[in-house]
Amino acid sequence: ASHTGKTVLAQKLLEKHKYPYLSIDHLKMGLIRSGYTKLTVKDDDKLTEYLWPIVREMIKTAIENRQNLIVEGCYIPFDWVNDFEKEYLDNIKYYCLVMSKKYIENNFDNIKKYANAVESRIDDEWCTMESVLDENTKFLKGAKKHNVNIVFIDDSYKVDIDL
């Protein structure tokens, strides 16, 4: 979900492990700004369909080349596992960051405050408590339905992933 700290976490993992990361948002904006797609930043579901085949093959290439790569972003389908054979899956760790309703309601000001911790968000007006609640509810349902690893942010923001 948006505003959960994915990019900050990827940056911390880069600094700790020296693994490069791919921000799917950067790929998205490059394709939109270059005119290679008519999709806009508001076309979330369509962007997932459009971006995922590219990202998926980048992941496969990194694994084939025995290279570490952190991929972060919202545009990964919950059924991503179906697109990889076992030899790839053995080399992939997936985590879905989701904030609880309680956390969002108690910390919304901080969520907005830290939105620019690693990236500059030019237009963040769409980010309301309601939109963050809705998006995190959607992501939690999707993650549970597909039985993926969830990093559930509930009482405090403590996200630490061991690679």
Report the location of each language-model feature.
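Conserved nucleotide-binding/hydrolysis micro-motifs of P-loop NTPases
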Residues: 26-29, 76-77, 99-105, 157-158
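ATP-binding Walker
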Residues: 3-4
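NTP-dependent small-molecule kinase module
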Residues: 137-163
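A glycine- and Lys/Arg-enriched "phosphate-lid" helix/loop adjacent to the NTP-binding pocket
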Residues: 92-138
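Conserved substrate/cofactor phosphate-moiety recognition/catalytic segment
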Residues: 11-54
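Conserved beta-strand scaffold positions in the cores of enzyme catalytic domains, especially
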Residues: 19-21, 91-96, 150-152
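Walker A/P-loop
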Residues: 7
